Amino acid sequence: NVRENLTLPLLLDGRNVNKNQLEQLAQILGIQDRMNHLPHQLSGGQQQRVSIGRALITSPALLLADEPTGNLDSKNSAEVMALLRYFHEKKGQTLLVITHDERIACQADRLITVEDGHIAQDEAVRP
């Protein structure tokens, strides 16, 4: 279920689950009412939020997001990017997003374009 999915990284690392932290994360992700649901009972956007939560439960300094909105509609894409921005801005986590979607790329502070395995462009997008 969602609860087990979110806490798996902590358990694999031999760390205790802080129930308050888990509840707060679920609230921020908007999945607090889905904690006992199985993956097939979740929408694509909810599944993506669970994946993000699983990546964030250990409070990493760096979050690597490879195509985080790849299979989502525009509404869910915007919600996922808002969640990632929240954790970047409020929790101070560095976010590295890999995407082919220009709408997602232009939301970055810095944009690095890679072509044929080489950096073709490196620019600040937002101050």
Protein language model regions, located:
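ABC family nucleotide-binding domain
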Residues: 2-107, 111-113
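H-loop (His-switch) and adjacent beta-strand-loop-beta switch element
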Residues: 111-123
